[in-house]
């Protein structure tokens, strides 16, 4: 048995189930998980399927807002041509799975990861099974997980259930997930709301993320300190571009190694001590905001 074809439905967003949990989403404690949005898993949907189109658009907005807020973003991705012994019981239900062809393995372009995002190689329904996702979340000081992607009643639900059992609060975004059909989508939301997580809409997620989007008040003034430290080290137009695009690379904008040391020294004087090697691997505003957020926490 393989994946079905011709999936085409409207997401069941009217009368969403009331979540038993009353947790409030906190951007300072949250991470985003983009679940299984590889081309192999979205090919079964018809072109323009409303549920998938909505899920991709909502996921794209959430990912952009998360990066701007310094919230970690994780992606799950399966490997192609899995050994049958490693694929295990999944092969009995879904066949051999994807090949190594990028037409199968690539994450769809609308929500493609940036260099600052993390990829989790997935092995089973749950994103936690045989992965280091839990360790990565703990290392980042995150105990809330915003989940988007496919398929709602399979991997999304399995991940939400295991997150709950690991004391991680799952927030499943009703309009940022898709499924094999409306009934499976609805049942997934009902199960999650009833026993393991909060069912939430993308607009509410965006509101929570944007309240921590790196503004002066939300970031404890670190944007101003970063800007002050870079003043005189970058051309004014490059400095403007750096803050306009939080994923832009400082070195591509004109910062050299000597000036980078001066920049890090200035931040250290303000209480943010950063490793030069780590900084050179991710010289972006989003990375700096995440480090500043961990100091503030």
Which residues make up each language-model segment?
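Conserved catalytic core of two-component sensor histidine kinases
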Residues: 53, 157, 261
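Short, contiguous, helix-prone interaction/anchoring segments in small proteins
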Residues: 25-62, 74
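Active-site-adjacent betaalpha module
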Residues: 1-31, 64, 68, 95-218
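Active-site loop/turn elements of alpha/beta-hydrolase fold enzymes
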Residues: 37, 78, 175
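Hydrophobic anchor at the start of a short beta-strand
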Residues: 73, 170, 274
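Acidic/polar short surface loop at catalytic or gating sites that assists cofactor/ion binding
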Residues: 82-100
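Von Willebrand factor
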Residues: 66-85
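Phosphopantetheine-dependent thiolation modules in NRPS/PKS and related acyl-activating systems
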Residues: 217-297
């Amino acid at each position: 048995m393989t994946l079905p074809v011709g999936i085409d439905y409207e997401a069941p967003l009217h009368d969403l189930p009331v979540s038993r949990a009353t947790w409030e989403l906190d951007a300072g404690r949250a991470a985003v998980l983009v679940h299984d949005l590889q081309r192999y898993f979205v090919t079964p949907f018809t072109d323009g399927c409303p549920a998938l189109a909505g899920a991709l658009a909502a996921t794209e907005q959430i990912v952009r807002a998360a990066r701007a807020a310094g919230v970690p973003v994780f992606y799950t991705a399966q490997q192609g041509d899995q050994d049958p012994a490693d694929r295990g019981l999944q092969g009995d239900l879904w066949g051999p799975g994807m090949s190594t062809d990028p037409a199968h393995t690539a994450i769809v372009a609308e929500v493609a990861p940036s260099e600052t995002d993390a990829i989790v190689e997935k092995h089973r329904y749950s994103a936690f099974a045989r992965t280091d996702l839990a360790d990565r979340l703990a290392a980042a000081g995150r105990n809330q997980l915003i989940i988007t992607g496919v398929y709602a009643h399979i991997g999304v639900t399995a991940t939400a259930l295991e997150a709950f059992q690991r004391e991680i609060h799952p927030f499943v975004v009703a309009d940022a997930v898709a499924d094999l059909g409306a009934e499976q989508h609805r049942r997934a939301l009902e199960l999650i709301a009833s026993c393991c997580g909060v069912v939430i809409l993308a607009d509410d997620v965006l509101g929570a993320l944007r309240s921590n989007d790196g503004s002066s008040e939300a970031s404890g003034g670190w944007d101003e300190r970063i800007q002050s430290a870079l003043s005189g080290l970058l051309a004014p137009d490059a400095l403007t571009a750096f803050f306009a695009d939080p994923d832009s690379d400082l070195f591509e904008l004109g910062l050299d190694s000597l000036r980078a040391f001066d920049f890090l020294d200035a931040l250290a004087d303000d209480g943010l001590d950063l490793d030069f090697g780590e900084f050179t691997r991710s010289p972006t505003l989003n990375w700096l905001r995440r480090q500043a957020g961990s100091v503030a926490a």
